[in-house]
């Protein structure tokens, strides 16, 4: 990770995040995520929250696809999700579009690796 590579020199680095803070239960998706990792060895992180959100979208595409799942039908199902609300976090999934979210949060990293919003 960037923190390991830079050590204390990371102080003041600004990083863009494309998901909500994994430590703020202000949105339903973060509350669901925190409940899912509760009582596990998983610590809340931006990376695992992003994976959780992606898994929710993938699950919805599988549900909508129905029987006969294959690569082509899955691509079509994902592209067909359109504007998808995943627990208060909006995704915009369309054919040929690879940037599925317009949410960007800028955070600053402290010398000890904490993230400040």
Regions found by a protein language model. Name each.
Residues 1-117:
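Extracytosolic ligand-binding ectodomains
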